[in-house]
Amino acid sequence: MNNFLEKRLKNIGIKKKSPSKSIANYLPCVLSNNLIFVSGQLPIDNGKIIYPGKCDLDLTESEIKQSVELATINMFSNLNEIIINQKKKISLIKCCNIKGYLNCSDKFENHPKTLNYCSDMIVKILGKKFGSHSRTAIGVNSLPLNAPVEIDGVFSINF
């Protein structure tokens, strides 16, 4: 089960990515008992934000979707890294909660729809039973590196 995520991502056509490195003094993932806390993930590919700017002013709907999906993939890459390094066999992975921060203007109102791209991908990866989660979508005035989105998550695992 420790390589479950890697196999699952491959089976649904998602190319495995190397886990992101922290851009400041924090860890990308922390395991505490049976909870894994994944730090906010940006839509970074090859060291760059794929589409910088505000969701509603600078990006098309397709670019927003790609950004959210890439941030979600980056979250799973970090989650996978901490899971494969465990000595014990993992029998269950469940997404408990996600938070999505959207770089947008005061007039933006599509927070729920935008974060659905992340939620849909999580359910696709983990299945409805283990992928369904609570969530919060938050509009903000800016994000690190002028990213359009940042996503963090809390997952539970059973040994």
Label every PLM stretch briefly.
Residues 1-159:
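Short, polar/acidic, helix-capping and beta-turn segments at strand->helix junctions
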